[in-house]
Amino acid sequence: MWTMFNNWKIFEDNLGFVPSEEIKDKLNEYYKILVEENLKYNLTRITNEEDVYEKHFLDSLLFTKETKIDNQKIIDIGTGPGFPGIVLKIFFPETDITLIDSNNKKINFLNIVIKKLNLKQIEAKHARAEELARIENEKYDIAISRAVAYLDVILELAVRFLKIQGKLILLKGPRADEEIKNSKNIDQKLKIKLTNKQSLADTGFGERINLFYEKEKSTPELYPREYAKIVKESGKK
């Protein structure tokens, strides 16, 4: 029988509640599928049970202490093996979530997870953000991305997906302030503003800084540009 994770106290300590039995069962099944399929798809270098639950599952949820996502239409950009999108769907089943990634193997994996966990109102798409954003312009209430790209790059890739007054949530590491400094005021060009910054101390899985933006106006037609051009002009040093 598969070993079941039992250190649910880390969720209570960091989120203020213990997951329901249904959520626990789905997370345990998700972990089992992740480890099994990782042998084929090379999804994550982190496979130890304790580490996956803390560094992937819990980390995917910490931002929810700062904003509500209930009943929101969400896009997870560069979702990889489903962080944070699958985790959010398990905890907040009433959300409507689209997962996108340019790696088709990861999309295949996500479809396995969605089917086995019987998740509803969630879709995995093999797509590039800069191309899909032109098609799905101003469609989402929330766009979210976890450790995908340098700040000015992900801002440009994500902003067109959002409705006006929609939220962009970026789950970052300890260098977020440096990325803001080097972003060349791209947020002003994109008509989006930083409204909140959540700083999380290192409690065993690294210092985290989560950034919250709000879209003020429609995205100028220029953006997003081709990916190569975005990266070439990035403020990353």
Curated annotation (Swiss-Prot):
SUPFAM superfamilies given in the database record: S-adenosyl-L-methionine-dependent methyltransferases
Keyword vocabulary terms for this entry: Cytoplasm, Methyltransferase, rRNA processing, S-adenosyl-L-methionine, Transferase
Superkingdom classification of source: Bacteria
One MF term in the entry's GO annotations: rRNA (guanine-N7-)-methyltransferase activity
Gene3D superfamilies the record matches: Vaccinia Virus protein VP39
Gene Ontology CC entries for this record: cytosol
Location(s), subcellular: Cytoplasm
InterPro entries membership: rRNA_ssu_MeTfrase_G (IPR003682), SAM-dependent_MTases_sf (IPR029063)
EC number: 2.1.1.-
Top-level EC class as recorded in UniProt: transferase
Keyword Methyltransferase listed: yes
Residues involved in S-adenosyl-L-methionine binding: 78, 83, 129-130, 146
Pfam families, per database record: GidB
Keyword Transmembrane: no
Cystine bridges: none
Role summary: Specifically methylates the N7 position of a guanine in 16S rRNA.
HAMAP family: 16SrRNA_methyltr_G
Family per record: Belongs to the methyltransferase superfamily. RNA methyltransferase RsmG family.
Protein name in the entry: Ribosomal RNA small subunit methyltransferase G
UniProt organism field: Mesoplasma florum (strain ATCC 33453 / NBRC 100688 / NCTC 11704 / L1)
Gene that encodes it: rsmG
